């Protein structure tokens, strides 16, 4: 698929890039997709599922507005997700932490998603999400060290944790049992110490589409 999104979290510059929309599952036990990573439904009880998972978070290049700041390498994450399915709604809560790359700390991710099938081929989903990032995670993403400050002219900045909330919707047309076309749109809002970072307040935008 094709993705049009900010070139880094907090940016006001958008870029278009190719984005794979793979969605693979092995019955109700294993799953893999770009949004949720690779997971194993270790516990399945009624409408509840508990799954350990691994995934990936992208990094940030040090070019254009950020050319005098340090580059941030993306990395792998590991976490645990609990999900509850009730009628057309799917609720989930996950805790995840990196084990490679330049970002330390952890995140707590809460999601709710409404799903509806309009016909044999058309599907839609819509739902809110809330992500809390720890002090270390936020500092690695939005902080500015004394060295970076001297190079860039931005004020030194050492943030604490922050929350990001948003809304995401999708529309899917099924071509066959294996292939489909999906359009996804969303908006999110950075708050607190992330919103106040010079990377966002001076050269970026707290509202992300």
What are these language model-derived features?
Residues 1-6, 30-38, 62-67, 90-99:
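Transmembrane beta-strand segments that form the barrel wall of outer-membrane beta-barrel proteins
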């Amino acid at each position: 698929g094709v993705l049009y999104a900010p070139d880094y979290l907090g940016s006001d510059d958008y870029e278009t890039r190719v984005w794979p929309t793979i969605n693979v599952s092995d019955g109700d036990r294993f799953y893999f997709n770009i949004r949720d990573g690779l997971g194993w439904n270790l516990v399945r009880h009624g409408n509840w599922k508990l799954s350990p998972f691994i995934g990936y978070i992208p990094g940030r290049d040090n070019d254009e507005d950020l050319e005098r700041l340090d580059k941030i390498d993306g990395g792998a994450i590991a976490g645990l997700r609990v999900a509850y399915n009730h009628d057309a709604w799917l609720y989930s809560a996950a805790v995840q932490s990196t084990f490679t790359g330049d970002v330390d700390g952890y995140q707590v991710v809460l999601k709710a998603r409404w799903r509806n099938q309009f016909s044999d081929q058309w599907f839609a989903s819509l739902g809110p999400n809330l992500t809390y990032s720890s002090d270390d995670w936020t500092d690695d993403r939005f902080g500015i060290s004394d060295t970076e400050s001297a190079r860039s002219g931005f004020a030194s900045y050492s943030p604490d944790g922050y929350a990001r909330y948003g809304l995401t919707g999708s529309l899917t047309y099924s071509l066959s049992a294996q292939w489909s076309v999906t359009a996804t749109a969303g908006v999110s809002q950075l708050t607190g110490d992330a919103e106040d970072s010079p990377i966002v307040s001076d050269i970026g935008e707290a509202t992300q589409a």
